[in-house]
């Protein structure tokens, strides 16, 4: 029995693009000197409401990026985007990284820095105000941004949870 549900996302059917967020060089000290390795954080998305992130580790930069892309394709989530922005304000925390995202009017642009900008660009969000608080570690900032985007509830979900119609939700 397969576990595929109506909400499962097949990354093979999406036109995913990738964006490199951060490359880190690590060193292992061995008898003959230092062995260098690399890890890469990559954000993948179709700029139409699907986004994911991946972490790849390898001895070469290109291999680490390729592994990150493959990992990112396995972690794709759907983001509800309304008129180019998010439906409501979000505060998400992962580790000591905290990300605040606020919806913005059309024409505002994507006001975000570093890792959060990459996540929102790949998701297809065009107008949003963000602030990254706490740790600036790209690993945790990306995870906090994705966690926040996952926690977005669109109007249909809210209406379903409250056992009301869509119009009743907006009237209250």
Swiss-Prot record:
GO biological process, one term: translation
Domain S5 DRBM, first and last residues per copy: 16-79
Intrachain S-S bonds: none
Molecular-function annotations in GO: rRNA binding; structural constituent of ribosome
Key words of the record: Ribonucleoprotein, Ribosomal protein, RNA-binding, rRNA-binding
GO cellular component: small ribosomal subunit
Entries under Pfam families matching the protein: Ribosomal_S5, Ribosomal_S5_C
Gene3D superfamilies: 3.30.160.20, 3.30.230.10
Assembly, per entry: Part of the 30S ribosomal subunit. Contacts proteins S4 and S8.
Similarity comment: family membership: Belongs to the universal ribosomal protein uS5 family.
Protein purpose: With S4 and S12 plays an important role in translational accuracy.
Domain free text: The N-terminal domain interacts with the head of the 30S subunit; the C-terminal domain interacts with the body and contacts protein S4. The interaction surface between S4 and S5 is involved in control of translational fidelity.
Name by which UniProt lists this protein: Small ribosomal subunit protein uS5
Organism name: Chlorobium phaeovibrioides (strain DSM 265 / 1930)
Gene name for this UniProt entry: rpsE
């Amino acid at each position: 029995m397969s576990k595929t549900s109506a909400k499962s996302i097949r990354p093979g059917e999406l036109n995913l693009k990738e964006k490199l967020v951060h490359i880190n060089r690590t060193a292992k000290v061995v008898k003959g000197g230092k062995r260098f390795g690399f890890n890469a954080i990559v954000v993948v998305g179709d700029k139409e409401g699907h986004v994911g992130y991946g972490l790849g580790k390898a001895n070469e930069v290109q291999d680490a990026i390729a592994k990150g892309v493959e990992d990112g394709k396995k972690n794709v989530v759907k983001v509800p985007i309304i008129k180019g922005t998010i439906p409501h304000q979000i505060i998400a925390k992962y580790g000591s990284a905290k990300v605040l995202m606020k919806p913005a009017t059309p024409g505002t642009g994507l006001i975000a820095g570093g890792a959060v900008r990459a996540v929102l660009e790949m998701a297809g969000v065009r107008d949003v105000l963000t602030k990254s608080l706490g740790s600036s570690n790209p690993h945790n900032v990306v995870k906090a941004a994705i966690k926040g985007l996952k926690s977005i509830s669109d109007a249909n979900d809210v209406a379903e949870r409250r056992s009301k119609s869509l119009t009743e939700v907006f009237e209250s």
